[in-house]
Amino acid sequence: MGCVRNKIVKRAARTIAEKYFQRLDSTFDHNLLVVQDVAVVQSKKLKNEIAGYLTSLYKKILKGTYNKVYIKSHEEERERKENVIPKESMLDVDCVEVDDVTMEMIKRYGYEGNFKVYGM
């Protein structure tokens, strides 16, 4: 059974993950050094808890199972993928290729358009 972490640890780790995501790693020792450089925490126990939660948080973010952290580079990449415009629209095609069954349905319902049966 895992350790339940308090709000201070979670909030500090989330803030560090948002601001310094590029410096993080999937190892506890590396993240402990990042916490020591970035945060002003006097307690050794609290530093270790933040670094441990930061390590698990980093792994969850890489997997894509944790959505509560806003990382600027990830958001820019997501927007770039969403804004891709195809060179040729599917709606602007002169002739739509359909299979035999679909062509029979089109004729039965009386739809008009430029349909063509493609060969298999």
Swiss-Prot record:
Gene3D superfamilies: Ribosomal protein S17e-like. GO terms for cellular component: cytoplasm; ribonucleoprotein complex; ribosome. Signal peptide: none annotated. One of its GO terms (molecular function) is structural constituent of ribosome. Component of the small ribosomal subunit. GO terms for biological process: translation. The keyword Cell wall biogenesis/degradation does not apply. Keywords: Cytoplasm, Ribonucleoprotein, Ribosomal protein. Its main location: cytoplasm. It is found in: Cytoplasm. Belongs to the eukaryotic ribosomal protein eS17 family. This is Small ribosomal subunit protein eS17. The gene is RPS17. Pfam families: Ribosomal_S17e. It comes from Encephalitozoon cuniculi (strain GB-M1) (Microsporidian parasite).
